Swiss-Prot record:
Gene3D superfamilies: Vaccinia Virus protein VP39. This is Ribosomal lysine N-methyltransferase 5. It comes from Eremothecium gossypii (strain ATCC 10895 / CBS 109.51 / FGSC 9923 / NRRL Y-1056). Keywords: Methyltransferase, S-adenosyl-L-methionine, Transferase. It is an enzyme of class 2 (transferase). InterPro entries: Methyltransf_16 (IPR019410), SAM-dependent_MTases_sf (IPR029063). GO terms for cellular component: cytosol; protein-containing complex. S-adenosyl-L-methionine-dependent protein-lysine N-methyltransferase that methylates 60S ribosomal protein L1. GO terms for biological process: methylation. S-adenosyl-L-methionine binds at residues 87, 141-143, 163, 214, 237. It comes from the Eukaryota.
Amino acid sequence: MLQLCPLDEDTLYTHVYERYVELDRHAETLAQDLGIHASDAETLVVDIAPAQPTKSSDTYSLTVSQSLASLRSSTVNNNSTTGYVLWSGTPFFLCWLLYAPSAAPLRDGGRVPVTDSAAQFLQLPPLFSAPARPVCVVELGSGAAGVAAIVLANYVDRYLVSDQKAILKPLRANLLANISEVSRRTVCSKQTPELSSNRRTPARCELELIALDWERIATVPAALRPTDAAHVHVLALDVVYNDFLIPPLLTAIKRLLRWYADEHAVKATAYVLVHLRAQDILQTFLEHAIIDLRLRCYYMDEERLRSSRFALYYVTL
């Protein structure tokens, strides 16, 4: 069962300690590496499927190109190179989101129990669109693989995939190579029309690539507007790995949430998936979010998440 654990300036430290105790408990069953999905291949097949697929299961198979040479370079993209490879957090999150019964409140919206709070439940807004509830997803720091964009474009009306300008060329190539995997919706793209498809379905997804370096946001790009979305979800998967990047990432998230609320009268929330590496990185992330920026941060507690090397947080204003 999924539970939300609200964190504050006191409980965050207990949470970090307990989460790493849990991580140690599962150490023998978890990969002891940096988290690159495939560290020995430039081209890889990424399958998003349940553990036991059936004929009715939605499954996806993507062929992704990555650059291990760029990852290891000290000169490429001003030494900002992690986006050139696929990290394991994205496939893990997608498989959990799509197939775990406990993730249904994220997919479709629903009440989730809240621990240690006067409020017994919190209503999560649906991450997946429905005819009466158009949804927009803004992915920050997507990386060149574009796996989340292709898979989630099947379920939302608008998907805005963003990263640094240098990442957009390989990202565009991977999206084009896998656009056929968006099978549940017709894709339309104003800025990259070659991504557009013609499916026999009235459901549509606007898929746009946007250059956005969250270390240097002078103004929020107009391309991030919500159009007619009832809700905007900001998605950040496995981008918390360096203490230097934590303040600009969280500042960008807060700025976007506030921009949607104040400039567009649209509620926005965020999901941040953290790969658990150094304990002090997670603590710094939570301290900056909760203490410095006064964001509301909930740890998403669920059996499969708990037994993984990842921690998922729900963040609101």
